[in-house]
C-alpha cells in the first residue's frame, strides 16, 4: 500500500490520508491509536487544542522512533487563542504540548472571534519557522472577509465533506489559491443510510471492500485530505487499506449522484458564537 500526497500552495507535500483523534481521550488511548497507525504506515495525525490530546500525539511521535519530518501534524487554534500577540503565545504552548519545534499545518478551528488578528500571528509564525503551513476550518460566512485580509493564502480548508455533501462549490472557490480541502465527517457522521446506499454496496462487492472503504477511496480520488477517527486497531487498518485499488470515472460519476446537499452539522454563524464562551485547558 502506498500513501498518496497532496502538494500544498507553498510547495510542501502533505500525506493525503491520516488518523483523526477527535474525542479520543488524552494519554494511553491517544498514544496507542497513533502508534498503531504509525506501524501500519500512517504519517498524518489530525488533532486540535480543543481535542485536549495534543500531548498524547506528541508522546506517540516521540515513542514511535520516527523522525520528526516523517510525520505530518495538523492541529488547530481555538477562538479563545485568537488575536495579535495572543495567538503567537498560544502557538508556543502548542509546540510544548506536542513536544516539537514546528507544526506542519496550523488551522483556525472556527470562524468566530478575532480571526484576522490570529491570522496575522500565524503568518508571523510561518516567518519564524514555528509553523510550515496555515489554513482554516469551518469557515463559511466569514470566508471572504478572511481571504481579503491575508498575505499568505490558506493552504487548506477543513470542512464537512462526504458523498452527500461533496463541497464542489467551495472547492471551485478555493481553487484559485491552490487550497486543499480536508474532510471531516468523511463517512457522513456514521450515517447508516449513506453506508447502505446501493451504489456503495455494489462498488464494495466489485472491489471486495466495505462501503466505508469505497467512500474513503472516493475522497482520495476527489483530491481531498481525509483522516477518519478510530481507536480500534482493526478499523485503523481497514481504513488505511484503500491504496490497492482505484475507482473508475464511471464509478465516480455514479457516486456523484448521491450529492443531495445533506449536512450533518447545521449550526449557523450566530449559533457558532457559543464557542467564544469556552476555553480549552492548556
Predicted features and spans:
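CE4/NodB-like, metal-dependent polysaccharide N-deacetylase domain
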Residues: 87-107, 124-128
Amino acid at each position: 500500500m502506498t500513501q498518496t500526497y497532496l502538494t500544498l500552495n507553498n510547495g510542501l507535500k502533505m500525506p493525503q490520508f491520516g488518523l483523526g483523534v477527535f474525542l479520543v481521550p488524552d494519554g494511553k488511548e491517544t498514544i496507542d491509536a497513533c502508534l498503531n497507525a504509525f506501524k501500519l504506515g500512517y504519517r498524518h495525525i489530525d488533532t486540535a487544542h480543543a481535542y485536549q490530546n495534543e500531548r498524547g500525539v506528541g508522546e506517540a511521535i516521540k515513542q514511535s522512533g520516527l523522525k520528526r519530518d516523517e510525520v505530518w501534524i495538523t492541529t488547530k487554534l481555538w477562538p479563545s487563542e485568537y488575536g495579535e500577540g495572543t495567538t503567537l503565545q498560544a502557538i508556543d504552548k502548542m509546540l510544548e504540548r506536542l513536544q516539537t519545534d514546528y507544526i506542519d499545518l496550523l488551522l483556525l478551528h472556527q470562524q468566530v472571534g478575532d480571526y484576522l488578528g490570529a491570522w496575522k500571528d500565524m503568518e508571523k509564525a510561518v516567518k519564524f519557522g514555528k509553523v510550515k503551513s496555515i489554513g482554516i476550518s469551518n469557515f463559511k460566512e466569514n470566508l471572504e472577509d478572511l481571504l481579503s485580509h491575508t498575505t499568505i493564502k490558506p493552504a487548506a480548508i477543513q470542512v464537512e465533506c462526504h458523498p452527500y455533501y461533496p463541497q464542489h462549490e467551495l472547492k471551485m472557490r478555493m481553487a484559485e489559491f491552490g487550497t486543499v480541502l480536508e474532510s471531516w465527517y468523511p463517512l457522513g457522521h456514521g450515517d447508516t443510510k449513506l453506508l447502505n446506499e446501493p451504489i456503495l454496496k455494489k462498488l464494495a462487492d466489485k472491489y471486495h471492500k466495505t462501503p466505508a472503504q469505497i467512500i474513503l477511496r472516493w475522497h482520495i480520488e476527489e483530491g481531498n485530505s481525509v483522516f477518519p477517527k478510530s481507536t480500534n486497531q482493526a478499523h485503523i487498518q481497514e481504513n488505511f487499506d484503500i491504496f490497492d485499488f482505484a475507482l473508475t470515472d464511471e464509478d465516480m460519476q455514479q457516486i456523484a449522484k448521491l450529492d443531495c446537499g445533506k449536512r450533518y452539522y447545521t449550526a449557523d454563524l450566530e449559533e457558532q458564537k457559543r464557542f467564544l464562551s469556552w476555553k480549552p485547558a492548556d
